[in-house]
Amino acid sequence: MNADNSESLLAETIKSLKKKDFSVYLNRWLRTLANHDNTTILAYFRDETPQILLADSETRAVHQNMSHVYLNGVYLLDPFYELHNSGADTNLYRMSDIAPDQFSRNQYFLEYYQRTTIIDEIAFIIWPSPQMSVHVCLGRDIRSKRRFTIRELSSAKQVLPIVETLVCEHWGNLRFSSEDHGENVLERMVRLVSETHGVQLTKRQ
């Protein structure tokens, strides 16, 4: 990590607050710390579809199925979404630490995650408001073919307070798009169970 470059990019990130290119500068700065291959920034709301704030990767497969598979309901099975759903504390989380036992055999992994080619992923979970969390996810995929080192994880962990401040300042007033009049979470879960298991549930169930 080049300390001077990191500080310079942090300054540029601060200058970009409230501007359209904020997420781009945030990503560039974080890359000097974690040297990640891909970035996904998502806003999760209560009972609504997540909103993509940034999707950046040189490996096409990472985000290829995000819009029509992940946002179509599979996100409900994402261990990171469960952190939102359970109101987890603001922190830096690693997928391999929070994923359920036999993660490589479960539905989320088989139907979506393995196709992204991501082999390691960490996420800053930030709460700009009680109803919304923003997840800044940094991943390693087949491009580098390696997991994050202890040093990289430590560097990312150290800047958590800065990331939290930046995210809350920039996206503190973000609201769910009123243009989406589709299913809510309950309706989406009923449909997902029906499609994957052939079981017809009612909303009451």
PLM ranges: what are they?
Residues 5-17, 21-142, 155, 161-171:
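Regulatory input/activation interfaces that engage signals or partners
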